[in-house]
Design a protein with these regions (language model features):
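Ribosome-associated RNA-binding proteins
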Residues: 1-157
């Protein structure tokens, strides 16, 4: 198995028309990853969410990390940010998909030391996806454990 890329993304939800919130999310992702995020436009129209395909403001922002920046971000995530999560018992073991990729949800961005107090005035979550070239989830989990990601024990906590 091989770690191909890390995608850090954040959906803006009901704040998609709020320019200030969009700016906060963009600045947060830029400070955390060191790269400028790309706005994601809706692919499908969903009437109940008042979203039209390809129209209006972005519904989310994402950054794709590869190479040295990917490993640097992973190191900061594992050694600095994860220990700062309140009531953290390990990363969830259910975040693997069939292809062996791993998804990690972070409930608030304040765990990253790059962000100051004014950057965390409005809290929002992040999604971190580890795209792994692997045959199954067991191989991917073993790879991520070697990198140092602490997973929950099999029996719960």
């Amino acid at each position: 198995p091989k770690l191909e890329k890390i995608v850090v993304s954040c959906g803006v939800g009901r704040h998609r028309d709020d320019k200030r919130f969009q700016e906060i999310v963009t600045n947060t992702l830029m400070k955390i990853t060191g790269q400028r995020p790309v706005g994601r436009i809706a692919k499908k129209s969903i009437a109940s969410f008042k979203i039209r395909a390809g129209m209006g403001a972005p519904i989310g922002h994402s950054v794709t990390l590869r190479g040295a920046r990917m490993y640097e971000f992973m190191d900061r995530l594992i050694n600095v940010a994860m220990p700062r999560i309140r009531d953290f018992h390990g990363a969830g073991a259910k975040g693997f998909d069939r292809g062996g990729n791993y998804n990690l949800g972070i409930s608030e961005q304040s765990i990253f030391p790059e962000l100051g107090y004014e950057d965390t005035a409005i809290l929002h979550g992040l999604q971190v996806t580890f795209v792994i070239q692997s045959k199954n989830a067991e191989h991917s989990r073993a790879l991520l454990e070697k990198f140092g990601i602490p997973f929950e024990k099999k029996g719960g906590k």
